[in-house]
Amino acid sequence: MNCYKTHTCEELRKNDVEKEVTLSGWLYRKRDHGNLIFVDLRDFYGITQLVFNNDKDFFDEISNLKLESVITVTGIVEARTEDTVNSSISTGEIEVIVNNLRVESEVEFHFDEEIAKEERSILVSITGEQEYPENMRFKYRFLDLRREKVRNNIILRSQIIAELRKLMIERGFLEIQTPILTASSPEGARDYLVPSRLNPGKFYALPQAPQIFKQLLMVSGFDKYFQIAPCFRDEDARADRSPGEFYQLDLEMSFVTQEDIFQIIESTLYRVFAKFSRKSVDKDFPRITYKEAMLKYGSDKPDLRNPLLISDVTEIFRDSGFNIFKSNIERGMVVRAIPAPKTAEEPRSFFDKKIEHAQKEFGAKGLGYITFDKDGTAKGPIAKFLDENRLNHIREATNIEPGDSVFFASDKENEAANIAGKVRTLLGSELSLIDDNIFRFCWIIDFPYFVYDDKSKKIDFFHNPFSMPHGGLKDLEDKNPLDILAYQYDLVCNGIELSSGAIRNNKLDIMYKAFAIAGYSRGEVDTRFGALVRAFRFGVPPHGGIAPGVDRIVMLLADEPNIREVICFPMNQQGEDVLMGAPSKVEDKHLRELSLKVIE
């Protein structure tokens, strides 16, 4: 028999009345009624009410014991009276009359009063009564994790990962681990570097993704690979991005098309989202080209819950009487229109605040608006410069109705798309147009293969350099590089990018040509990607893959606004682990072993 417990704190029911039981857990709440003390004992599974009578010799001990101390009790189960039943907990019909108490571990506050004050205050948060600054929560994460909501997020994460793993195995995928210490790669973010003691002056890199390894597995003859892969990128924190490390459902398949991968991911994620959320899950995963996404939504991560669609109204304003937009168009710029339903009767301050916000927060320049009264009359600072024919074209292009308004953004094409997209998001939120009770997915496809980098003044890869271009080698040789599309795709849910993937290039001549366009010599390719180049000489199957982000999936299903809430031991926004004190300085002898020196 277990000396610590016969039952968990969630198990006991009315049919256990008169049984002698032993329970262990944390002293969660305590209520002193003079001759009786009621204690809520909490373990991982639930809560049970304990009753301590003042005729017991341990009454003073429990009276003075601090909350969150760990105890073991033995006692008799009794039914609560009808008026004291607690329906909010599963054990609410019973209580345990304690006959024996053993203190396993008592809370002891730090001798420094300032630190002790901090420790006492953070204990209060465990009952859910008060929130604390993120750094304090992370410093005492072992206490923060005792909170029901935080604990449930970590349990949910475990359950989701188990379900993903089960579904992958059901579909014939093999779980294979790839190296953590590897070579630096041009994934687009900064690497975390690890110095080699045995090879002075050389460094390993923590993998930004298992990209090359999973392609090598396909070359090796494995048909379907997956792993819950840890990835490491030295990036700044965001609400949907944790600094340092993250996890993804990394997978790769041989002899597949883009649609084959879509079908696997759609069926997998639909089952996971439907199982772990009470929200509706849209079964439709529409395919939207990158070009269409940037035009209609102003983003390659569109939130399809937002019904607003952006329109291109450049031609309507060409040669118009509104000189600001007319001049912009003559200089090669565009004009985008964003509808704002049922806002025509809003005061002018409503529109001025939106424009001011867009200017300050989005860097917007050419902005304006038109309101269309219920009788159809157009008003606003732009309306007087447009004839009725142009106004009708705006009504048709934006599909608005009387009583609606339209915001406009004019700039270079990419900038105008970005600004219009942010205005669309702002309006969708402030006008309460977004349904928070549904998950809507979409695929973004046909990304550009290359992009012109204004800073370096050269062509570079838009996304993954190992993807297959549309048209293969012929397009690389014959087309303007900026017109070439790639078999690359992103999966988006409610405006959050869950995953990127691609059909891979499996031919050396295409690889060399693509990298040549991006400014890499054949020798540089051989040096930087030697393993892949060697492998590609020995028969490479057509293959492709994808890697949905586990942290973001859990964040969405937990309905948390910040990804750090679903990570067990997260870093703060500065990339610091305040619990363990990382990053930290190391001793000089360790640096000497690694042939390193810190320059102040």
Curated annotation (Swiss-Prot):
Q: Which NCBIfam families match?
A: aspS_bact, PRK00476.1
Q: Where is this site: Important for tRNA non-discrimination?
A: H33
- Classification via CDD domains: AspRS_core, EcAspRS_like_N
SUPFAM superfamilies to which the protein is assigned, alphabetical:
Class II aaRS and biotin synthetases (SSF55681), GAD domain-like (SSF55261), Nucleic acid-binding proteins (SSF50249)
Record's protein name? Aspartate--tRNA(Asp/Asn) ligase
Quaternary structure (record): Homodimer.
A GO BP entry is:
aspartyl-tRNA aminoacylation
**Can you state which reaction this protein catalyses?**
tRNA(Asx) + L-aspartate + ATP = L-aspartyl-tRNA(Asx) + AMP + diphosphate
**Entry's localization field:** Cytoplasm
One Pfam match, by short name? tRNA_anti-codon
Record-linked InterPro entries? Aa-tRNA-synt_II (IPR004364), aa-tRNA-synth_II (IPR006195), aa-tRNA-synth_II/BPL/LPL (IPR045864), Asp-tRNA-ligase_1 (IPR004524), Asp-tRNA-ligase_1_N (IPR047089), Asp/Asn-tRNA-synth_IIb (IPR002312), AspRS_core (IPR047090), GAD-like_sf (IPR004115)
| Entry GO terms, CC | cytoplasm
Q: Which gene encodes it?
A: aspS
Sum up the protein's function in the record's words: Aspartyl-tRNA synthetase with relaxed tRNA specificity since it is able to aspartylate not only its cognate tRNA(Asp) but also tRNA(Asn). Reaction proceeds in two steps: L-aspartate is first activated by ATP to form Asp-AMP and then transferred to the acceptor end of tRNA(Asp/Asn).
- Keyword check for Mitochondrion: no
**Might you give the EC number(s) for this enzyme?**
6.1.1.23
Amino-acid positions noted as binding L-aspartate in the UniProt annotation, renumbered to this chain: E187, R233, H463, R504
Similarity section: Belongs to the class-II aminoacyl-tRNA synthetase family. Type 1 subfamily.
List S-S links within the chain.
none
Keyword terms of this UniProt record? Aminoacyl-tRNA synthetase, ATP-binding, Cytoplasm, Ligase, Nucleotide-binding, Protein biosynthesis
Q: Name one GO molecular function term.
A: nucleic acid binding
